Structures are given as C-alpha cells and as structure tokens.
From Swiss-Prot:
Organism of this sequence: Rattus norvegicus (Rat)
Biased composition (Pro residues): 582-598
Family: Belongs to the RIMBP family.
Basic and acidic residues bias (residue ranges): 603-616, 735-746
Gene3D superfamilies: Immunoglobulins (2.60.40.10), SH3 Domains (2.30.30.40)
Entry protein name: RIMS-binding protein 2
Lineage: Eukaryota, Metazoa, Chordata, Craniata, Vertebrata
Length: 1049
C-alpha cells in the first residue's frame, strides 16, 4: 500500500509539472500570435497611407492630362517625359513596357507606377526632375516579390524588365511549386491548366520564364508548362488583364492588327472611379509600345461640327525606339481616305463636303508606317445625325462548343465597354478595343450578351435621348458537345527499346476542366491503317510507345493519333510517317539448342529407375541443411543449370509454423480425419457420390482405350493416378507475373483465358477419340523428381513410377533435363505433373503442321526474360497477336514459333492455342496478325473447350497445420487463399501449380491452398465431401496475377 501511495504521489507531481510546461507553451504561442497580429496591423497601416498618397496622385493626374509628342528628325516617336538627373532618356523608353508590369523598384522595395513617366502639363521638355510615386497593390498579397529574394533572382528580374518583350501564355498543365523538386518553391508561380499568364523576356538557363498571373502574382514559370498564344499571321502583343482586386492599371485583352481580340479569363470588375480610359489619364498599354503591333493615333476628338464639315483632332501614337518609321496619317470617312497629313504637322483635320444634318459618318485616323497601316477602328468616332452612345453591329462569330468571339463597332474609340453575359457583368473592355473572346462556355446553351458603352466624358453635344441609348444586345447558342479536336504535331521517333517506336504529339487545347469542343477528354489512341495499336489514358499525355511488331504485321508506313473522349473519338490527326529504318525487321537467329545436362539427386538413382535423374547443378545450388517431411526451402533462382530456359521464375510457399510433422504422423492424421468425416457423412450423399464417380468421363477409359507402342497408356483419373503422376499429357498450369498482366493495353480480356488450367488447353489438342495421345516420333514424358530425403525408403513408389515411364518401346527414348520443382523439398508422396515437359523442339519442327496461338500478354525478351540469350533466341509479341507455332514445346517450356517472318522461341505460359474451324479461317487469322480488339473472351473459351469431354478431377487433402493467410501468408493477395485448421478435409481441384499452391474448396469457400500444409487422404478410406462434386466442371475464379513470395519462418 505504501508503494502504491508513493507511486500515486509521484504521478500527481509529474502531472502538475506537465501542466505547468503546457501552460508556459500556450502562453508563448499566444505571445507569438499577438506579435504577428501587431506586425500585420502595422503593414496594413503603412499600406493605407500609401493608398491615400496614391489616390491624391491620381486626382492630380485626372486634372492634368498627359501628352506624348513626336520629337526629332528621324521620325522616331519619343515620350514627353521629365527626366531624372543622370538618367539617360533611352533608359526611360526601354523600360517603359516592363515598368507597367513590374515597375522600377525604389528604395523601399515598392514599384513605380506609370505616373513616374507622365508629364503633368506642357508641350515641351521641362527641366530634368522626377517625383517618385510608389504603388502597392494591397488586395493582391503576392503582387510583388519579397525583399528576401536573392541577388540572382533580382538580377534576372532586372534583365527581363529591360527587355520589353511581353508574351501571353496559357498553362498547359496545373502546377503546384510546393509539390515540385525545386528548393525555393516560393519563387515559382502556381499554375492552373487553361489559365492565362504573361511572361517577360527570354527563358533562363534553367528553362524558366519570368511570369505574372492575371491577379498580379509574379514569379518563375517552367517553360514546359506553358504555350504561347500568338498567331503567326497576326500582330500580337499581350496586355495585362483587369482583375477584381484594386489594380490601378487596367489590364485587358489581346490586340491584333485589324482583328483585335480580347480574351476572357474570368469575371472581372474595375472601379470606374479609378480606371479611366478617356481623356482624364494617359491610356498607355503594352500594346502601345510593343514590337508586334502598328501604333495607332490616340484620343480622337470632335473639335467642331458644322452643317457641311467637321474638325477633328487626335494625339500621336507612342512608338517604341527602333520599332520603325511613322511617315504620315490618313484621315478616312466611311473607310474612304479623304486626306493624308505628313508626320510633324498639326494633328488636326478639317473634313468638308459632309451633310451632318441628314447623314451619319464614321471618321477614322490611321498611321502609315514602314510596317503597314494601323487599325482604323482604334481611332474612330461617329458624327452626324442620330448618333448614339451605344455600339452598333454586334456580332458573334467563331462559335464553338465552349467559345465564341464577340465584335462590335464603337461609336467612339475612346469609350470603354462593359460586357454582360446573361445579365451578369463579366468584364470591362478598354478603349480602342472592339472584340471580345468568350471561353469556358457550356455546350448547347443559349446566351444573351449585352455591351454597355462607358464614355470617357459626357457627350454633351448629343441630345438626351441619344445619350441614354448606351447599350446593345445580341443572342447566340453554343454548339452541342461534339468530338474533341485531334492532336497536333504528330511525330514518330525511335523508342526506348529496339522493339518499339515513340509516337509524340501536342494535345489539343483543353479547358481547366479537361474539355475539348465540349467533350470530356479521357486519353489518346494511336492508329495504323484504321486499327488502334496503342492507347494512353491521360488527358494531358503527349506521347505513347508503340510496339514495332504490330506496325510490321499491319505493314503500316504511317500512324495517326485521335483524341478519345466520352463523346467519341476525334478525327485523325495529320499522318506521321514512320522512319523506314525502324520498320526493317532484324535478321532471324537460328537456335542451336545446347545439349541437356544430366541431372543427379541425393537419392539413390537405382531406386528411381533407369530414366530418372536429378540435375546436379540444382543439387549444388541447394542451401545446406536437412530437409524434413513438410518443410520447404526456397530454391536458388540464380543457379539455373546451363542449357535451361526459364519461362517465369518460381515462387515460394509460406512455411508451416512449429515442429515439422513426420510422414508417419501425417499419414495417421489423414487417415483419422478421413474416417471421422466418413462416419459423419450421410448414406444418401455417399451413394450419390459413388454414382457420380462411376459415371465420370474417365471411369472406363482403361477398357475403352488401347495403346500402341510406343504410346503411353492413358488411365482413369483415380486418386492413385494423381499420386503416381499424370498421364494425360497436360501442359503445366503457368501463372503469370504481375508485370505481364499490367502491361496489357486492352484490359487483358485475353488474359482471362489463363484462369483455365493450361494443361486442359494442351490436352484437348493431344487427346483424340476417347483419350489417345497424338502420335509422335518419340516419347516425351519426363518425370519430375522430388529430391527430398523424406522420400528415401519409398522405393516401392519410385520403382512403380519408374516402371511406368520405362513402359514405352519400339522407338528411341529421349531424355531431357529435369525441371527442379518446389515440391522437391516438400516430402509429398505424389509426383506433381505441373512441370512435365511435353516435347523438345526437333530440328525439323517447321516441317510439322503449324498451329495457331494467341498471345495472352505483352512480352519483351529484352526486359522480361531471365535468359541471357533472350534477345537472339526469343520472340517479342503483344497481347492478342497471332503466332504460328511448329511442333510441341521443348523441355524448357518454350514453343518454336514465327512472328513477322522471324523464327524464335515463345514461352508456353504466355500464349494459348486457337482452334480454327478450317484452313481458310487459319489463313485469315495469320493475315490479320492480331485478334480483333472486341473479340469476347467467351468466344475464345468456347472455341478452345470445343471437343473437350473431361473435367478437372478432384482429390481430398487433410490439413496438417492451422493456416490463416492474414497472419501466415507472405503474399499480398491474401484474400485469394483459404483459411483452414488442422484436420480439415479440403477438396483439391486439378494439379499443383508452379507456385506450389492447389486450388481447393472448404465449407463452400474456394481459393488457393499451400501444398506443404496438406497431406493426401489414403485411398483405402472412403470419404464423401457433401459440398464438393467428384469432378469440378467449372472454371476457377480469376487469380490475381501477382508473383507469390514468402520469407523463411
């Protein structure tokens, strides 16, 4: 009690100490939070002061309109800008474009607004002085770079700022810098697929651009994530986009020469009290001083309107240094040139011979330059009768499923326009713009567009009713969702391996939701001669590997790519030619089979008969130590003897826990369990079982079938048959690895065939008219050795087996290397036929009748085969490919076959035979080269099961150990295995697979059972399992194509 009390006091003391520490930490956290709040409040106060200062500057700018005059005899337009002492004038001009985006960073880290370069009044250069004014975009938290950025980052920024090259881009993919590999993700911009952004200057050495999002965020942009939006036939210059935040520079649109387009990015709002596109502020934009657009006159003004004439004035354009030469102005009336004024004269014109009282005229002014004329609609106005503020001739063109282009004729190019879509304000279009591009619309939907004109100043010369008419409407409907657009720029190059080519393309433009023409893009398909040869399921994929074997089988010279979607496929892209050198098949390599190496065993070979030997190299590769009755040692997969091939690596069974069970005890357990089940079985069910057993398809095969030498006699499927070895000539059940299954390009419909034991497929070819084996020149049966010391002393069974296999006569006997089996260490008292080899490839195999097989999986010997000479000896193939096979498979489990005029070896566990109805059908399959993509598995299975009159036999096994796959199994797919307890009677269907597992049934549940946990029920004990029929005639369920592995206990 005393110790308990002391312990309690100690715990209470520790609890109090922990509470004290917790309180101290909480107080520290609160102090940190309060400090952060105070810091944020201070920043907010500073920003508010700067905002007020900027507002006062803007008021001054509204009162004093800036102007830009043309100076110099070289006809080079220069800005009328007050110069700072010691600062070259060219530096102002070169930095003007990017200063709008980035600004010249002042001493406090803020950005200079364009007002730094705007004169307040006067038409002549004043004394050099400049009053700095800084702009902080408070509503955009990342509108400027942090002051902590390194010097390299700042130098890159300065370099791009001075270049003046601005480009509009669209993000091809979404990108989160914090998920990327770079060490400074805060210096990069997050991207959203389909969104627009601006990049400055050239790409740096790391492949990044200096960029800015439409909300003002700036940072690095990976070049492979963006596409430039620029028409080679159009003059392009990007402008900043107007946003919902308090950006005081109005950014909007793309202006194209004679075809200006404003792109819709997102619903935006601009405070009309701040943004003024009229005469109150200098309307300077990137397109005004860009290199790719013809500068246009600004701010056309109606100075005087008379009955027969009008006087108009304008301001000269802003021409970047080195852009070109502006020679004169053209004054047009209704697109007809009335006069031409030389550059340097007064920017005013008197236009006569007009009837303004009865007619309406459109007056326009354009620049004549060495690089073409400017757009007349960027400097235009209407005069005369019935002039209203609203725009006219609204049109919607280029309507697609998700986009449309709106255009109009402005009453005055100084007016800005507000765009409404379905009565919701969408965006503001700046002055001198008359087109707008809608994106992200919904397919097959009606829209109503309203354009509201906003004059830069009230047109008092117009009557009230004409001033009030300030809007125009138009309606349109988008197209129904249709096929997506095809990919572009398709090319074919050499692939990663010699057996494939790489097809690359540029995906079509997608919306942020992954739509193309309103269709939900799911992937891309590669086609050759109208047949799909490859498919990739990824909306943003830009390439796929295509196996050359398919292209050669189709004799294709070019490929095309289609965009796949839920609404169908697109049209074919432009054909891409396949380089001829890639289509040339490699020269065939004749196979020289190495002589088989005799096998030895630790058993006395005299007990096994004259034809039974064990591979010495296999025995040498075994780890040291005794082998017990049901203990299993993993074989060494790296010590395969010379001359042997490995269709697929072996797998290892789980190990029983506890002491090993001796053979005597195992027999006793099996007998006791069998007798216990037999006593509890009902007589009626036992009678039914006996009737079904006696009526089985193999019951009387001994009496019905005779054997001619040297053929091996086929017996009924009794338990003794399976204890001594199968005589049905069945092909081993080969389980395929996950790598074969997952690489299937068509969902592996064909791979479902492998769920049927492959020995059944082979036996239906080998057995004729009641169970005879097809005649062959030699006897190809071979015995798999159970090289276990526990088999010593069972010479009677070994001798019996030896006698059976020395039964043949009248012809030469062929001996083959014995394939080492997992059962070699299990101490089982029956010999599994899973590794029996049916034949060896004869030198004249091509002279035998050809058989048609279909590939169940993709197979590339270079990457998938464990054999060193795979590239020369083995053939690659694709799932569904038709293969011509000569003869039976050899001792290593390989067929000799032909694909694309090349002979080589084919692993038996990767193909399945097809039974053609006649020669014409066989020729058709060979010409086609591949099974059609839509061939149902049921049709193939019916074909291969036709003529088969036997079912998979069943046997009874007793469990020697408890087995819970969730605890004892080292495999991933534990749900595929059965749970059982010691003494349970399990019905086993067919033979053991090469992994060492049976397919069995217990209490109505079916699954895989490790063979080293089971013991055969003795033949002299009659057992009837009421829930298991004597012959299992149904296909086992799909097995997960995963290699089974285990760890030693």
């Amino acid at each position: 009690m005393r110790e308990a009390a002391e312990r309690r006091q100690q715990l209470e003391l520790e609890h109090e100490q922990a509470l004290a520490i917790l309180n101290a930490k909480q107080q520290e956290i609160q102090l940190l939070q309060q400090s952060k709040v105070r810091e944020l409040e201070e920043k907010c106060r500073v920003q508010s002061e700067q905002f007020n200062l900027l507002s006062r500057d803007l008021e001054k700018f509204r009162q004093h309109a800036g102007s830009i005059d043309l100076l110099g005899s070289n006809s080079v337009a220069l800005l009328d800008v007050p110069l700072a002492p010691g600062k070259p004038f060219s530096q102002y001009m070169n930095g003007l474009a990017t200063s709008i985006h980035k600004g010249h960073e002042g001493p406090t880290g803020h950005y200079s607004v364009i007002g730094d370069y705007i004169p307040l009044s006067g038409d002549k250069l004043e004394s050099p002085c400049v009053k700095p004014s800084f702009l902080l975009r408070s509503s955009s938290p990342r509108c400027r770079f942090e002051s902590e950025m390194d010097d390299d980052r700042s130098s890159n920024k300065s370099k791009h700022s001075s270049s003046g090259k601005v480009h509009l881009c669209v993000a091809r993919y979404s990108y989160n810098p914090f998920d990327g590999p770079n060490e400074n993700p805060e210096a990069e911009l997050p991207l959203t697929a389909g969104k627009y952004l601006y990049v400055y200057g050239d790409m740096d050495e790391d492949g990044f651009y200096e960029g800015e999002l439409l909300d003002g965020q700036r940072g690095l942009v990976p070049s492979n994530f963006v596409d430039f939006i620029q028409d080679n036939e159009s003059r392009f210059a990007g402008t900043l986009g107007s946003e919902q935040d308090q950006n005081f520079l109005n950014h909007s649109g793309i202006s194209l020469e004679r075809d200006s387009i404003l792109h819709l990015h997102s619903p935006t709002q601009v405070d009309s009290g701040i943004t003024d596109n009229g005469g109150g502020t200098l309307d300077v934009n990137i397109d005004d001083i860009g290199e790719d657009i013809v500068p246009y006159p600004r701010k056309i003004t109606l100075i005087k309107q008379l009955a027969k004439s009008v006087i108009v004035g304008w301001e000269p354009p802003a021409v970047p240094p080195g852009w070109g030469t502006v020679s004169s102005y053209n004054v047009l009336v209704d697109k007809e040139t009335r006069m031409s004024l030389a550059l340097g004269r007064r920017t005013k014109a008197l236009i006569e011979k007009l009837n303004t009282a009865a007619c309406t005229y459109r007056i326009s002014v354009q620049c004549v330059t060495s690089r073409g004329n400017s757009d007349e609609l960027q400097c235009t106005l209407l005069v005369g009768k019935d002039v209203v503020v609203a725009p006219s001739q609204l049109r919607v063109d280029n309507i697609t499923q998700i986009s449309a282009q709106l255009s109009w004729l402005p009453t005055n190019s100084n007016y800005s326009h507000i765009i409404f879509l379905n009565e919701e304000e969408l965006d503001i279009v700046k002055a001198a713009r008359y087109k707008y591009q809608f994106f992200n619309l919904r397919p097959n939907m009606a829209y109503k567009v309203k354009v509201l004109a906003q004059p830069h100043q009230m047109p008092w010369q117009l009557p009230l009713e004409q001033r009030e008419k300030d809007e125009a409407c138009v309606e349109f409907s988008t197209l129904p969702a249709g096929p997506p657009a095809p990919p572009q720029d398709v090319t074919v190059q050499a692939g990663a391996t010699t057996a494939s080519v790489q097809v690359s393309w540029k995906p079509p433009a997608l919306t942020p939701t992954g739509l193309s023409n309103g269709a939900n893009v799911t992937g891309y398909g590669v086609y050759a001669k109208g047949q799909r040869v490859a498919e990739v399921i990824a909306p943003t994929a830009n390439g796929a590997a295509v196996e050359l074997v398919r292209l050669r089988s189709l004799e294709a010279k070019a490929v095309s790519v289609r965009t796949l979607s839920a609404q169908g496929e697109s049209m074919d892209s432009a054909l891409a030619a396949i380089p001829p050198d890639l289509l040339v098949p490699p020269a065939p390599h004749p196979r020289t089979a190495p002589p088989p190496k005799p096998l030895t065993s630790d058993m006395d070979t005299k007990d096994l008969g004259p034809h039974v030997k064990v591979d010495e190299s296999w025995e040498q590769s075994r780890p040291p130590g005794p082998a017990h009755g049901h203990m299993l040692e993993p074989p060494d997969m790296h010590s395969t003897g010379p001359g042997r091939r490995s269709p697929s690596p072996s797998r290892i069974l789980p190990q029983p826990q506890g002491a090993p069970v001796s053979t005597t005890v195992a027999k006793a357990m099996a007998r006791e369990a069998a007798q216990r089940v037999a006593e509890t079985s009902k007589l009626e069910k036992r009678s039914l079982f006996l009737e079904q057993s006696s009526a089985g398809p193999y019951a009387n095969s001994d009496e019905e079938d005779g054997y001619a030498s040297p053929e091996v006699k086929r017996r009924g499927t009794s338990v003794d048959d399976f204890l001594k070895g199968s005589e049905l000539g069945q092909q081993p059940h080969c389980c395929h690895g996950d790598e074969y299954h997952t690489e299937s390009s068509r969902g592996s419909d064909l791979s479902d065939i492998m769920e049927e034991d492959e020995e059944e497929l082979y036996s239906e070819m080998q057995l004729e008219d009641g169970g005879r084996r097809r005649p062959s020149g030699t006897s190809h049966n071979a015995l798999k050795i159970l090289g276990n010391s526990a088999l010593m002393g069972r010479g009677d069974r070994m001798e019996h087996v030896s006698r059976r296999y020395s039964h043949s006569g009248g012809g030469p006997q062929r001996h083959r290397p014995m394939a080492p089996s997992i059962d070699e260490y299990t101490g089982r008292d029956h010999l599994s036929p899973d590794f029996y080899d049916e034949s060896e490839t004869d030198p004249g195999a091509e002279e035998l009748p050809a058989r048609i097989f279909v590939a169940l999986f993709d197979y590339d010997p270079l990457t998938m085969s464990p054999n060193p000479d795979a590239a020369e000896e083995e053939l690659p193939f694709k799932e569904g490919q038709i293969i011509k096979v000569y003869g039976d498979k050899d001792a290593d489990g390989f067929y000799r076959g032909e694909t694309c005029a090349r002979l080589g070896l084919i692993p038996c566990n990767m193909v399945s035979e097809i039974h053609a109805d006649d020669e014409e059908m066989m020729d058709q399959l060979l010409r086609q080269g591949f099974l059609p993509l839509n061939t149902p598995v049921e049709k193939i299975e019916r074909s291969r099961r036709s003529g088969r009159g036997h079912s998979v036999p069943t046997r009874r096994m007793v469990a020697l150990y408890d087995y819970d796959p969730r605890e004892s199994s080292p495999n991933v797919d534990v749900e595929a295995e059965l749970l059982f307890c010691t003494g349970d009677i399990i019905t086993v269907f067919g033979e053991i697979d090469e992994d060492g597992f049976y397919y069995g049934e217990l209490n109505g549940q079916k699954g895989l059972v490790p063979s080293n946990f089971l013991e055969e029920v003795p033949d002299d004990v009659e057992v009837h399992l009421s829930d298991a029929p004597p012959h299992y005639s149904h296909d086992p369920p799909m097995r997960t194509k995963a290699k089974r592995v285990s760890q030693p206990p």
